[in-house]
Amino acid sequence: MRFGVLISVFVAIVSALPLQEGPLNKRAYPSFEAYSNYKVDRTDLETFLDKQKDVSLYYLLQNIAYPEGQFNDGVPGTVIASPSTSNPDYYYQWTRDSAITFLTVLSELEDNNFNTTLAKAVEYYINTSYNLQRTSNPSGSFDDENHKGLGEPKFNTDGSAYTGAWGRPQNDGPALRAYAISRYLNDVNSLNKGKLVLTDSGDINFSSTEDIYKNIIKPDLEYVIGYWDSTGFDLWEENQGRHFFTSLVQQKALAYAVDIAKSFDDGDFANTLSSTASTLESYLSGSDGGFVNTDVNHIVENPDLLQQNSRQGLDSATYIGPLLTHDIGESSSTPFDVDNEYVLQSYYLLLEDNKDRYSVNSAYSAGAAIGRYPEDVYNGDGSSEGNPWFLATAYAAQVPYKLVYDAKSASNDITINKINYDFFNKYIVDLSTINSGYQSSDSVTIKSGSDEFNTVADNLVTFGDSFLQVILDHINDDGSLNEQLNRNTGYSTSAYSLTWSSGALLEAIRLRNKVKALA
């Protein structure tokens, strides 16, 4: 299979650079090397996606430190956000970005029969997580109440604390890490007979899955339980307050870990996880959180900023969070999957805004290049005018793909109501062709397997493809993805080879392939 070829190619180009000795000099160790003899073919989307899956995986793995990998200017298990060391300097490991990266690695692991090369990379990440948890930092220390230091957002690549000014704390990181590692434990049990792959290696801080649960997952969960109702900075590291994305990933981490805690006879903690997850679910959906705003009929990412009249609340985080917390084919008690009408309306309104906001989108009638939020002014090198982000655009493609996958795989109907009507009627199907008397105030159910259902499903896939076409039009010739594309010219800008960008595209291609396999 192509994955095996990719791993062979990847191992063959392992960098000969030595590990750093003495004070960290990150600029002395560039880690970027373009995919060998590859140039993007822009003539056909299908051909591009077929080839790009391996290319995006290559660039994602290139930014992870592990013995079989190319990047070795870092402790094994380190994930750099980007090789970029200036304008902007992203040569650090973020707790959030690393966890999201390894969620993508886990998708590949699960689709490739527990590939041991990837499993080793995951376990090195788990080992590094143990050490980072216990590294005192400006946010606090492991020994503080509820492990306060776990809210530290980023560290140097050698595992030392970053002590510069930053937006602290960031409470989504521990939740995402706990979820990613918990998911790996389930993979180990279901795909590898409960056996870890690094237990005989030196300098590893665990010898069993129970060690991982008790010493790495549980502290992160204790942090979430202790601080879920405290303010922190958002995933974009700009605003302190309450955040839909943060609360959603926290709820996911707690709910997902209940059965794991029970499996290790930690019943009392499992009960605490369950009760706190239920409290968070109510907080997410109710008036206390303020995230579901019926006055504007969309999810508000940061209600505090809406109250201050500094933002309208539209944000790509309101669909990125649902995608990260609802893996395909997974039965989940976490609310706000992408079929939620408020998630879809938020997605639709951001798309409508960005179509007018970014002139690069004048070339597109359906999908578009999507930014973080309408009021964004960060261009990667200071503040002026915000740009579309490749990762936000790749996640935008995933939304319609997941709608189709979930409906088809479970033979579910598709329900259109007055909240999500505008999205479906404008971009997916003229609802008057289904029911000539249909009004936007009505609710209509499109029955699974019907001709109308198949039309809607096909059109949703085509709509998702229109976002990937935007990426094809603006991706670098070597298949790497920057953080942003210029709002006017479409040229790549900001940090190059952003790990999260490659991961988001890889997940979009994976989801699209699974939808196609259902046809």
Swiss-Prot record:
Glycosylation (residues): 115, 127, 205
Name of this chain's protein: Glucoamylase GLA1
Gene Ontology CC terms, in alphabetical order: fungal-type vacuole
Enzyme Commission number(s) of this protein: 3.2.1.3
SUPFAM superfamilies: Six-hairpin glycosidases
Gene3D superfamilies on file: 1.50.10.10
Binding-site positions, substrate: 166
Reaction(s) this enzyme catalyzes, per UniProt: Hydrolysis of terminal (1->4)-linked alpha-D-glucose residues successively from non-reducing ends of the chains with release of beta-D-glucose
Lineage: Eukaryota, Fungi, Dikarya, Ascomycota, Saccharomycotina
Record flagged with keyword Glycoprotein: yes
Residue numbers annotated as active site: 234 (proton acceptor), 237 (proton donor)
Top-level enzyme category: hydrolase
UniProt xrefs under PANTHER family: GLUCOAMYLASE, INTRACELLULAR SPORULATION-SPECIFIC, TREHALASE
Signal sequence bounds: 1-27
One Pfam match: Glyco_hydro_15
GO molecular function: glucan 1,4-alpha-glucosidase activity
Similarity annotation: Belongs to the glycosyl hydrolase 15 family.
Keyword field: Carbohydrate metabolism, Glycoprotein, Glycosidase, Hydrolase, Polysaccharide degradation, Signal
Keyword ATP-binding: no
GO terms (BP aspect): polysaccharide catabolic process
